[in-house]
């Protein structure tokens, strides 16, 4: 192996603004396969760490792949430090996790990382399931999120169903959802963005609710009828990008929602089953 060594000057290492830890597909636009190009459109450097590697989502007639083995997963994380690629790291985001053991490995890595990066923004999308499908991850993942990742996160982005699972509370109306979100706040966890709160069905609206200790902001967006997958992953990519570019939380959430709507409508124009990113207009 040593005879192949070419790059040993760590001062030349490419640096990341963001490490994105979530699923990856060979075909399609979910997980890091949509998040990475979206983040790069915002002019930020991102390193993608896969938790599962799949041919495509399970919504097609064939489907291959699975969770990344723990040895590989821990090695991917360790290698970023061995390459000295995290000197300028500002944020870590997480999405779909393959196993509870991955969550524990990631939490241990984040805990060590925070010693050198005390201001690191950790944003967790606790992907567990939704109202229509129920839980679609391994049954031990919700407890792993509660035990390992929520105590490290500064912000989380659950949907209503995931908020119910994490808190054990009914969240089907706005007041109860807000109360449940507030019950999760702590010295570390500063905000919860509920990504699918109750909206106005008659007016074709959906709501995103931003909950912190000091305020609650309800943001309404037009509802787009679609079966497109990966919109939540895109939302989180846009949200973390907006925050790192200096936007206030509620403004970043609003802008992320508008961008998702723009991408969905653009994709529909091309009659595609997978999200297509249009160029990003500078504000």
From Swiss-Prot:
GO molecular function ontology, one term from the record: hydroxymethylpyrimidine kinase activity
Gene3D superfamilies: 3.40.1190.20
GO BP annotation list: pyridoxal 5'-phosphate salvage
Cytoplasm in keyword set: no
Keyword Isomerase attributed: no
GO CC annotations on file: cytosol
Swiss-Prot/TrEMBL catalytic activity: pyridoxal + ATP = pyridoxal 5'-phosphate + ADP + H(+); pyridoxine + ATP = pyridoxine 5'-phosphate + ADP + H(+); pyridoxamine + ATP = pyridoxamine 5'-phosphate + ADP + H(+)
Keywords from the UniProt entry: ATP-binding, Kinase, Magnesium, Metal-binding, Nucleotide-binding, Transferase, Zinc
Protein residues bound to ATP: 125, 157, 162, 195, 221-224, 231
One Pfam family this sequence matches: Phos_pyr_kin
Assigned EC number: 2.7.1.35
Pathway: Cofactor metabolism; pyridoxal 5'-phosphate salvage; pyridoxal 5'-phosphate from pyridoxal: step 1/1; Cofactor metabolism; pyridoxal 5'-phosphate salvage; pyridoxine 5'-phosphate from pyridoxine: step 1/1; Cofactor metabolism; pyridoxal 5'-phosphate salvage; pyridoxamine 5'-phosphate from pyridoxamine: step 1/1
Record-listed Mg(2+) binding positions: 136, 162
Cofactor: Mg(2+)
Annotated positions binding substrate: 23, 59, 233
InterPro entries assigned to the protein according to its UniProt record, in alphabetical order: PdxK (IPR023479), PM/HMP-P_kinase-1 (IPR013749), PyrdxlKinase (IPR004625), Ribokinase-like (IPR029056)
Source superkingdom: Bacteria
Family under the similarity heading: Belongs to the pyridoxine kinase family. PdxK subfamily.
Subunit structure of this chain's protein: Homodimer.
Protein purpose: B6-vitamer kinase involved in the salvage pathway of pyridoxal 5'-phosphate (PLP). Catalyzes the phosphorylation of pyridoxine (PN), pyridoxal (PL), and pyridoxamine (PM), forming their respective 5'-phosphorylated esters, i.e. PNP, PLP and PMP.
HAMAP family associated with the record: PdxK
Protein name in UniProt: Pyridoxine/pyridoxal/pyridoxamine kinase
Gene: pdxK
């Amino acid at each position: 192996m040593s005879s192949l060594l070419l790059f040993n000057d760590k001062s030349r290492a490419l640096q990341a603004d963001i490490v994105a830890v979530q699923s990856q597909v060979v075909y399609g636009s979910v997980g890091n396969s949509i998040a990475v190009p979206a983040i790069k459109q915002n002019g930020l450097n991102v390193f993608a760490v896969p938790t599962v590697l799949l041919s495509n989502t399970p919504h097609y007639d064939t489907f291959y792949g699975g969770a990344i083995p723990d040895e590989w997963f821990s090695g991917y994380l360790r290698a970023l430090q061995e390459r000295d690629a995290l000197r300028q790291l500002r944020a870590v985001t997480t999405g779909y996790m393959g196993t509870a053991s991955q969550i524990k490995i990631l939490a241990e890595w984040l805990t060590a990382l925070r010693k050198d990066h005390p201001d690191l923004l950790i944003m967790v999308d606790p992907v567990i399931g939704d109202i229509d499908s129920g839980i679609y991850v391994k049954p031990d993942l919700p407890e792993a999120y509660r035990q390992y990742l929520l105590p490290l996160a500064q912000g989380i982005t659950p949907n209503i169903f995931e908020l119910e699972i994490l808190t054990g509370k009914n969240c089907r109306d706005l007041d109860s959802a807000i109360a449940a979100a507030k019950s999760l706040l702590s010295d570390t966890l500063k905000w919860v963005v509920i990504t699918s709160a109750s909206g106005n069905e008659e007016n074709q609206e959906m709501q995103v609710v931003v909950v912190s200790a000091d305020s609650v902001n309800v943001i309404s967006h037009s509802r787009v009828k679609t079966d497109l997958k990966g919109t939540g992953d895109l939302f989180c990519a846009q949200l973390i990008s907006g925050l790192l570019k200096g936007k206030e939380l509620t403004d970043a959430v609003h802008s992320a929602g508008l961008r998702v709507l723009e991408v969905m409508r653009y994709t529909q124009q091309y009659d595609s089953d997978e999200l297509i990113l249009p160029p990003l207009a500078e504000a």
